[in-house]
Amino acid sequence: MKIYYDQDADLSLLADKTVAIIGYGSQGHAHAQNLRDSGVKVVIGQRPGGPNWELAKENGFTPMSAAEAAAAADLIMILVPDQHQKAVYEKDVLPHLKPGKMLLFAHGFNIHFQQIVPPADVDVAMVAPKGPGHLVRRVYTEGAGVPCLIAIHQNATGKAMETALAYAKGVGGTRGGVLTTTFKEETETDLFGEQAVLCGGAAELVKAGFETLCEAGYQPEIAYFECLHELKLIVDLMYEGGLSRMRYSISDTAEYGDYVSGPRVVTDETRAEMRQILKEIQDGTFARDFIMENMSGRAHFLSMRRINAEHPIEKVGAKLRGMMSWLKK
């Protein structure tokens, strides 16, 4: 894998360019402010009237419509949520995609699944910081950077990689390292990680553990501490030094239980389901379902959200978190 650093990127390639950030949300505010602090001219495309419009003004920008920003820019980074990107692209961006411009994304969903099909005469790239926007901004202001992924989908100008690397340098990515990937790889692995491990897998594991203890007669408050609250302690150790750091830091009792009981939770059947989840991502089944869900009004999605919000673990957790002064800061 090729990894790029500061010395591999030329920020001067953006000296006479204007970058449009479409969507001033979690990633948008970080990209915009970091680029500006790197000396790049930035315009903000944001829906008027909302909190992000006001936040952009508070941060010293003069926000405008997405169409106005796209018209004014040479590089256009689309950072609105996945389900809104196609509509924003077709209505506000496409009419202003002149030959030689660059279209940028921080996630490959809409390009990989062909919800957005740019004209052949523009560059299309991805620069994806591997951290939330507030971290991307904070680390940049501290003189470092969050590592990024970079991918090229179209190289109409012959300089797409150089331009994308300049953008990555502007947001601070080359300070930490910019790793090469493809739109396909980033999209499929990102979706799999979210569904099987980080969100779907972890949430269901936490709920199942909580329910198992409660059904066995243990107090819900104790079950919450053991199955949800303490998860952060373990994940932080893994985040800082991998599984080995976590196992070094826990008790021998916990480590032994890890080895003998973990494989009984993640069984061969679990692994088979994980492979099936990956297959449905790869063949487009998940993407089609998600796209159709949004097109049909999101009734099923909203129902699942409501049902999960009413799970007993949420009520117990709200009460216990109210006792934790450090969470109120």
Swiss-Prot record:
Involved in the biosynthesis of branched-chain amino acids (BCAA). Catalyzes an alkyl-migration followed by a ketol-acid reduction of (S)-2-acetolactate (S2AL) to yield (R)-2,3-dihydroxy-isovalerate. In the isomerase reaction, S2AL is rearranged via a Mg-dependent methyl migration to produce 3-hydroxy-3-methyl-2-ketobutyrate (HMKB). In the reductase reaction, this 2-ketoacid undergoes a metal-dependent reduction by NADPH to yield (R)-2,3-dihydroxy-isovalerate. NADP(+) binds at residues 24-27, 47, 82-85, 133. Pathway: Amino-acid biosynthesis; L-isoleucine biosynthesis; L-isoleucine from 2-oxobutanoate: step 2/4; Amino-acid biosynthesis; L-valine biosynthesis; L-valine from pyruvate: step 2/4. Mg(2+) 1 binds at residues 190, 194. This is Ketol-acid reductoisomerase (NADP(+)). Substrate binds at residue 251. One of its GO terms (biological process) is isoleucine biosynthetic process. GO terms for molecular function: ketol-acid reductoisomerase activity; magnesium ion binding; NADP binding. PANTHER family: KETOL-ACID REDUCTOISOMERASE, MITOCHONDRIAL. Belongs to the ketol-acid reductoisomerase family. Transmembrane segments: none annotated. It is an enzyme of class 1 (oxidoreductase). Residues 1-181 form the KARI N-terminal Rossmann domain. The active site is at 107. Disulfide bonds: none annotated. It comes from the Bacteria. Its EC number is 1.1.1.86. It comes from Solidesulfovibrio magneticus (strain ATCC 700980 / DSM 13731 / RS-1). GO terms for cellular component: cytosol. NCBIfam families: ilvC, PRK05479.1, PRK13403.1. Keywords: Amino-acid biosynthesis, Branched-chain amino acid biosynthesis, Magnesium, Metal-binding, NADP, Oxidoreductase. Binds 2 magnesium ions per subunit. It catalyses: (2R)-2,3-dihydroxy-3-methylbutanoate + NADP(+) = (2S)-2-acetolactate + NADPH + H(+); (2R,3R)-2,3-dihydroxy-3-methylpentanoate + NADP(+) = (S)-2-ethyl-2-hydroxy-3-oxobutanoate + NADPH + H(+). Its cofactor is Mg(2+). Mg(2+) 2 binds at residues 190, 226, 230. SUPFAM superfamilies: 6-phosphogluconate dehydrogenase C-terminal domain-like, NAD(P)-binding Rossmann-fold domains. It holds the Pfam family KARI_N.
